[in-house]
Amino acid sequence: MAKNIAVLVSGGGTNLQALIDAQGRGELGSGEIVAVISSKTGAYALERAAKAGIEGFVLPRKEFESNRAMTLALVDLLKGLNIDLVVLAGCMIIFTEELVQAYPNAIMNVHPALIPSFCGQGYYGLHVHEEALKYGVKLSGATVHFVSAECDGGPIIAQKAVEVRPDDTPEVLQKRIMEQAEWKLLPEAVKAFCEDRITVDGRTVIIK
């Protein structure tokens, strides 16, 4: 049975593009991206969606009095679109528990580090890679996980390690992790979900 996917974004949408490309190659199983929802007007991710013929929506954070008000509006929109899977792809909003309650084990996020390292409140974008380099790790990578009420705390679906090199800058490491891990892991996880190959037992995710 086909599954409707909504991708939530705030910026350029490089992970969205990886999903669009995978969809074009028939690599999302029975899943179809039917909506791209941005928290910012003018986000380039909306242009990516338009070029792919995917409907775009904008829910500007500044128009809502609180994150909860925005979350409730988002849930209404998702339900109206009959969404089965929500993917956070560079979305900078911390949604409240109502979203998780509406979509238990049906919201995926990609994080640019190997959780539980360099994750949680405040760890996003280049800052993650700055902290990894500052700590001196030899491996970093990416994690795709289900979203829970705890920031970056949901069950881990997939991880991929990426080498950290002595001359890396945060920007160089970010690019390598995107290319070698994020853009591969996320479409694979979405495909597994859409093919009903994922089961969750407590904190353990099993992919058949």
Where are these regions (language model features)?
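One-carbon transfer enzymes
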Residues: 1-208
